Amino acid sequence: MSYSVLEALRNNPDHVRKVLAARRLDVSLVDRFIELDGRWRQLKREVDELRRSYNQLSREGARAPPDRRREIVEKARELAARLEKVEKEMEAVEREREELLWSFPNLIHDSVPVCPEGVDSVPVRHWGTIRVVKGAAAPEGVEYVVVEKPPVGHADMAEVVLGMADTLKAGEVAGSRFYYLFDDLVWLDFALAMYALDRLAQQGFRPVVPPYMLKFDVIRRVLDFDTFKDAIYKIEGEDLYLIATAEHGIAAYLHKRELVEEELPLLFVGWSPCFRKEAGAGNRDLKGIFRVHIFHKVEQFVFSLPEDSWKWHEEITKNTESLIRDLGLPYRVVNICAHDLGAPAAKKYDIEAWYPAQGMYRELASCSNVTDWQSYRLGIRVTRKGMRREFVHTLNCTGLATTRTITAILENFQREDGAVEIPKALRPYLEPIRAAPKEYIYPRRRG
């Protein structure tokens, strides 16, 4: 089976038009592709016919008497010249067609919502009781308790109350969206990573630390490079880009690999720093460590048989829900609207934690089924019974992004005296470390 987008363009172009419209993209791309693909097929037939004719003439020339051989050789020369010309035209059309095919986003699952302006997601489920400040509106259908006093925001908790982060000095020496993290928040960062790695490894995911940089020809195959080239960092003078997530390095691990059916699924849990320019963020979340240029993240990644990928999409989403739920953080799962999916994803869930000081849910994790969008570009196939070859499906899902999870803990677990209770699920990962906090993080003594 060939690439699903190519199959749809050839056999059901109206469906692709519908997908592009739902994604708010240019539907005329379909007509341009059909035109190029038709021209390529025509030239391919002509090339095949010319090759057959040339081979036949070559065989005739070998058997022909001397008086006919010169005539056959001349015809063969004419055919060879014609073949070379048509082959060059076919290759040029093929390059243009492939470039256009790469610009198409993934198809979308039937359950992906098509949303009106101003709506980016649809709630699916929620967990936990949220705290809502008196007088503020509560989300519909969510259990909540009213509190009189507004909680302290995560930025002020980290920098002012606890005194364990410094974005002002980091801004002086590195620029905005960088930070210094100190003392118990450092241990909390490591504990969150170990917690997620340990839990997921126990579920059969293989731990991996991927390369932190990838070559251009590789990174352009794992993400929508034209859209995100301004959001990732390039190493000056080198053919290398810093990864924005462990997903990129893990996906590239099987670049140009041929698998057999029995090898799948392959489950990985990666840890890496993530480097992001946050070019489109503007002035959003400038305070604190919620949206920063570098952070640590644990990532689930699955290479799956095509027929199993939707089952795995639900499974890895539930894995992350379990991690967040066991931390005691109220959250909800939302189904991302078609126009906000990003090109690779056929469907995406976001998992959002409740931030009581802000009075809203904010994204902690994202879980996508990319189907064969990445594997087509990376050349990752599986040979099925009967020697049928297919592109594998790839899926990714945040385990925990440590700095964001810290911000959610700071808002949800703060006490009146300024201390922050450490979620019970994290305490076993802090216990062996003598210098680490065990049950509470207390404000740093100053002076």
Swiss-Prot record:
EC code: 6.1.1.11
Compartments in which it is found: Cytoplasm
Keyword terms of this UniProt record: Aminoacyl-tRNA synthetase, ATP-binding, Cytoplasm, Ligase, Nucleotide-binding, Protein biosynthesis
CDD domains membership: SerRS_core
Cellular compartments per GO CC: cytoplasm
Its job: Catalyzes the attachment of serine to tRNA(Ser). Is also able to aminoacylate tRNA(Sec) with serine, to form the misacylated tRNA L-seryl-tRNA(Sec), which will be further converted into selenocysteinyl-tRNA(Sec).
HAMAP family named among the record's database cross-references: Ser_tRNA_synth_type1
Protein name: Serine--tRNA ligase
Organism expressing this protein natively: Pyrobaculum neutrophilum (strain DSM 2338 / JCM 9278 / NBRC 100436 / V24Sta) (Thermoproteus neutrophilus)
Lineage summary: Archaea, Thermoproteota, Thermoprotei, Thermoproteales, Thermoproteaceae
